[in-house]
Amino acid sequence: MKKISHIITVMIAALTLAACNNAKVPGDYSKSESLPAIYPDYAGTTIPVNIAPLCFMYTGDATDMVTQIAYQDTEILCSGIKAVPDTDEWKELLNKAKGNKLQVTVYTENNDVWTQHKPFAISVSPDSI
């Protein structure tokens, strides 16, 4: 039983990472002035530069989600109802954004219609924990 549980966990992790690597920002979408319904809600928070990747999930009605986490010309894209940034990409992004803000933009799909939610910022402290 433990072996099956371990195999399932590894498969889910692999699929999640693959989803982040193949993500694309939708080409056609409407804009919403509302922040995305995510859990945990990281909007407006400050994080240390050496924190592990922040994962979150969309809690509203949607069949898919694309998350764009960016600072200047560096970005991470994840797809799926749960955003799970790649650890190496996350570390690189935080080091570049140290002392500045990340911009997070969430796109959700419902009934084949994409919506771009109001982007939010996450401040990156230059201090480590």
Task: Kindly give the residue locations of the regions a language model identified.
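Bacterial signal peptide processing site
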Residues: 21-23
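Low-complexity, Pro/Ser/Thr- and charge-rich linker/hinge segments at domain boundaries
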Residues: 38, 117-129
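Contiguous beta-strand segments within globular domains
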Residues: 39-62
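Signal that preferentially marks extracellular ectodomain short beta-strand elements
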Residues: 81-99
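Proline/serine/threonine-rich low-complexity linkers at boundaries of modular beta-sandwich domains
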Residues: 25-36
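C-terminal motif of bacterial Sec signal peptides marking the signal peptidase cleavage site
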Residues: 16-19
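Solvent-exposed loop/turn segments flanking beta-strands in beta-repeat/beta-sandwich domains
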Residues: 59-71
